[in-house]
Amino acid sequence: MVISSCDDNQIFDQYQSLPKYWNKDSVKTFSFVAPDTINSYNLYVNLRNNNDYKYSNLMLIVEMDYPNGKAVKDTLEYRMANPQGEFLGTGFTDVKENKLWYKGYEEPFVFSESGKYTVGVQQAMRENGQVSGITNLEGITDVGFRIERTK
């Protein structure tokens, strides 16, 4: 299921729902055409989590495939809860919305090529002291990708 939303700054905003868990081999992909190669944009990974999420952080592997075939892969860590264990996302129910910076926060992000890009998002969580990773991560209900105009 794909869910989209709309506002003035939005260029692209799409979610994909997950089953009861997020398998470590499941890559959620989002394809879009670059709006232009002149202006700068903010790029986000959006997540929804519920109380089944048992961790204070989240590790993701995010890969951007460019139109010319170049691929840039980043391993990213996000804080999901404060030291008291309260989730940092927004929302009044047990489902929290998280808007996590991907590109544009340290320096302006400009699409360097015209054409179709694909972004893949994969969970890379591990238990302390474990190498193999968490096979089925519970508590993440939706994964999304968003592009906004800079203000």
Regions found by a protein language model. Give the residues of each.
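Solvent-exposed serine/threonine-rich low-complexity stretches and specific carbohydrate-binding patches
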Residues: 15-16, 74-82
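Internal, hydrophobic beta-strand segments that form the core of beta-sheet-rich folds
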Residues: 112-149
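A mature extracytoplasmic/lumenal domain signature
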Residues: 47-49, 77, 106, 121-125
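C-terminal motif of bacterial Sec signal peptides marking the signal peptidase cleavage site
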Residues: 2-5
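Solvent-exposed strand-loop boundary residues in beta-sheet-rich modules
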Residues: 66-70, 84, 151
